A protein has these predicted regions:
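Beta-strand-dominated extracellular/periplasmic modules and repeats
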Residues: 1-179
Length: 179
């Protein structure tokens, strides 16, 4: 018996069995819980229904301990994703530098040979964002705005990831990972 091959793609196909997802880092309604939601959009502004979003974040005290702040979500037909987490606190580096509360976001999508890496900052942390060394290193105000999640309700933030085109989200490279 001969089985047909799956269609050729730039990357993939990806198989769901064995894929670990984790969208609730804390229970919905827990003290300090926030909902982070958004869409992954392509260059034309169309949803990416087969993407994958990973997040890493510190706990409410700004510490990275264990697997507290890790999540992974497949995008839905509308390109949407959502995580329930505690809002991260400011992170103090050993040299005394303070990073604003933020979420590190990794996005996998069709057509990308490598995932893209960005950061999500919170709109209600404007003073902390302004003092954050990475956020402040981005000279263009419009580009900085692509990194800010907008509060859309009580304990709810929206962060859309635009992969290219007008309003493209700012993406970063990291020398250690090669991303």
């Amino acid at each position: 018996m001969r089985l047909p091959r799956t269609p050729s793609q730039t990357v993939g196909p990806f198989f769901e069995f064995g894929l670990v997802t984790k969208t609730e880092l804390v229970e919905s309604g827990a003290p300090g819980a926030v909902l982070i939601e958004g869409q992954v959009l392509d260059g034309a502004g169309d949803p990416v229904p087969d993407g994958l979003v990973e997040i890493w974040l510190a706990d409410a005290e700004g510490r990275y301990e264990g697997n507290f702040g890790w999540g992974r979500c497949q995008t839905g037909p509308d390109g949407g994703y959502a995580f329930t987490s505690a809002k991260p606190g400011a992170v103090q580096e050993p040299d005394g530098t303070v990073q604003a509360p933020h979420v590190t976001v990794l996005c996998f999508a069709r057509g990308l040979l490598k995932p893209v890496l960005t950061r999500l900052y919170f709109s209600d942390e404007a003073d902390a964002n302004a003092a954050d060394p990475l956020f402040g290193a981005i000279g263009d105000e419009g580009e900085r705005a692509t990194l800010v999640a907008t509060a859309t309700g009580p304990a709810t933030y929206r962060f859309d990831i635009r992969l290219q085109g007008d309003g493209q989200t700012v993406f970063f490279t990291t020398p250690a990972s090669g991303l």
